[in-house]
A protein has these predicted regions:
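Long, highly charged low-complexity segments
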Residues: 1-35, 58, 65-76
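Conserved acidic catalytic centers in enzymes
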Residues: 17, 107, 216
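Extended, well-ordered alpha-helical scaffold/bundle regions in very large, multi-domain proteins
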Residues: 193-216
Length: 216
């Protein structure tokens, strides 16, 4: 758990990854449009900083919800790029908690599909392994989950934050590194215009998911 809240508002690129409690995601889809679930913690990575700020782990070690979310709002209010892997999920949850994001919202999952549309998997771990030679270390997380008798993928919120922090930070750091690779590939393949269109469409698609689409 970080001991301070750095001023990241002016960072040119900020990667963000949420840990959530989303109990019905497999049967009903993401819970954020109906607030079926919660943000458990926020991981942030910039050039020079990475931290995980836990707010709703069921077994303690949490930081003050309002202080963390006020800081998150300040962080995302700057003009820099905000980078997510599967942005509609994380941005949806941030929106559900009243967070308004300024600057470009970049989805590395979408960018990855543009760079290589023939992949079998667009998971962060798979992309990191194939393109960066890096994956998240999940050994300690799985050991802790085994001791607590929980599913490390679906029930992270049941673990104390100290077991989740490093894993969550790695998600944000890997997302930031992946974007550095994708930027050069988008330029090399000359698909900037397609990527820019996808990026501009994102807020529209998110609004449609949040409010629904009228069908006659």
């Amino acid at each position: 758990t970080p001991s301070h809240f750095p001023n990241l508002k002016d960072a040119k690129e900020i990667a963000i990854d949420l840990e959530t409690k989303d109990p019905n995601i497999k049967t009903k889809g993401p819970g954020w449009p109906t607030m079926d679930g919660n943000i458990v913690g926020v991981a942030v990575a910039t050039d020079g900083f990475a931290g995980y700020f836990p707010i709703a782990h069921e077994n303690g070690s949490n930081m003050d919800y309002k202080i963390v979310m006020d800081w998150v709002q300040e962080v995302v209010s700057g003009p820099g790029d905000k980078i997510f892997h599967n942005a509609s999920y994380d941005v949806g949850w941030l929106r559900a908690h009243g967070i308004k994001i300024s600057g470009r919202i970049i989805d590395t999952m979408v960018a990855s599909a543009l760079v290589d549309e023939n992949r079998f998997s667009y998971s962060l771990n798979s992309l990191g392994y194939d393109w960066l030679g890096e994956t998240k270390s999940e050994v300690e997380l799985k050991e802790a989950a085994s001791e607590w008798g929980i599913d490390p993928k679906q029930e992270l919120y049941k673990l104390p934050a100290k077991f989740v922090g490093f894993y969550a930070e790695q998600d944000a750091v890997l997302t930031l590194k992946l974007w550095q690779y994708l930027k050069t590939e988008i330029f090399r393949q000359e698909i900037q215009s397609v990527f820019n269109l996808e990026t501009e469409l994102f807020p529209v698609l998110l609004n449609m998911r949040a409010t629904g689409v009228r069908v006659n």
